From Swiss-Prot:
GO terms for biological process: fatty acid biosynthetic process. The keyword Coiled coil does not apply. InterPro entries: 4-PPantetheinyl_Trfase_dom, 4-PPantetheinyl_Trfase_dom_sf, ACPS, Ppantetheine-prot_Trfase_dom. It comes from Shewanella frigidimarina (strain NCIMB 400). GO terms for cellular component: cytoplasm. It catalyses: apo-[ACP] + CoA = holo-[ACP] + adenosine 3',5'-bisphosphate + H(+). This is Holo-[acyl-carrier-protein] synthase. Keywords: Cytoplasm, Fatty acid biosynthesis, Fatty acid metabolism, Lipid biosynthesis, Lipid metabolism, Magnesium, Metal-binding, Transferase. Transfers the 4'-phosphopantetheine moiety from coenzyme A to a Ser of acyl-carrier-protein. The lineage of its organism: Bacteria, Pseudomonadati, Pseudomonadota, Gammaproteobacteria, Alteromonadales. It holds the Pfam family ACPS.
Length: 126
């Protein structure tokens, strides 16, 4: 097994809060898949949830070497948690096609947040 991609992103949570105040849930609907959106809507801290998912998806897109665009959208990257609460990343559509081009088999993700920031790192392996 070899590393075929790595990406990191950091998001200022206040920026997400400002976007949410101005645009309501438009950003969330653009970034989150349906299951993620359902979790977001029930979250006690929706801005923090969205900031972490945004950072995670940007990190995943960077690991793919495309960023968001060039055939990869936010909707092609799904972040959820396993039974122990650890985050996991799954790829579909254009993101999955790009992962396969890289001969990637699996993505590992770490997400963290503190008062002002959310950060995520994704490592792709063959």
């Amino acid at each position: 097994m070899a590393i075929v991609g790595i990406g990191t992103d950091i998001v200022e949570i206040a920026r997400i809060s400002e976007q949410r105040e101005r645009l309501g849930d438009r950003l969330a609907r653009r970034v989150l898949t349906e299951p993620e959106l359902a979790t977001y809507m029930q979250s006690k801290q929706p801005e923090r949830f969205l900031a972490k998912r945004f950072a995670a998806k940007e990190a995943a897109a960077k690991a793919l070497g495309t960023g968001i665009g060039r055939g990869v959208s936010f909707q092609h990257i799904h972040i959820d948690n396993d039974a122990n609460g650890a985050p996991q990343v799954r790829f579909t559509d254009g993101a999955l096609a790009r992962l396969e081009q890289l001969a990637g088999k699996h993505g590992f993700i770490s997400i963290a947040d503190e008062k002002h920031y959310a950060v995520a790192t994704v490592v792709l392996e063959s």
